[in-house]
Amino acid sequence: MSQRRILTFLLFAAFLTFAIVCYWMLQREDIHLGDKFAVVKEGVLLRSMVPTISRLQEIDRRYQIKTIVALLNDEEIKHPALEAEQNFARQHGIRFIILRMGIPLPEQVTEFLEIVNNPIRQPVLVHCWHGTVRTGALVAIYRIKEEGWPLQKALDEMVSYGFNLEAPRYKSMLDIIQGYASKTESKVAPATNY
């Protein structure tokens, strides 16, 4: 066999392998390429970054979204992608709520938890622009307050979605999450040894 045929065969085999792996990954429900989508709690809470309309269609088809909570700043609210998402929500009977947010304020956290815990609004898809910081913080607080997760487990999940615990600009965000963890831990009865 000539070197050219061998090279052609190897390139074809590599492409075919790549195509098969991509197809397999797209079939798995727990792998979502690049959009930071995940089911936080089945039937209750989903998370992502700002989804494309095709991705939103897929998520809605699979999970029947009832509410979208967009955690956005003033600049992000002006982006055309948001208008397309709002139109999609309107056309599909999905309630669309914008929480203007940088670092979450206590009243915003309360509003978010009230939305998520209202069965009429479930499942709720929450997202910020990149699906990392604001989404990560509110999901961490949800995990701590509603699911009883320890702080470190919630922070580990945030890191798995790209949150940088060492970034100085996020210190106040971490302080807020730690504050919710402290309040939750203080409500747990101390262990007794008999």
Task: Outline where the language-model segments fall.
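Substrate/cofactor-recognition hotspot
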Residues: 131
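Short cysteine clusters
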Residues: 128
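Cys-dependent protein tyrosine phosphatase-like superfamily
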Residues: 2-124, 140-194
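Ser/Thr-glycine-rich phosphate-binding loops at phosphate-binding pockets of nucleotides
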Residues: 135
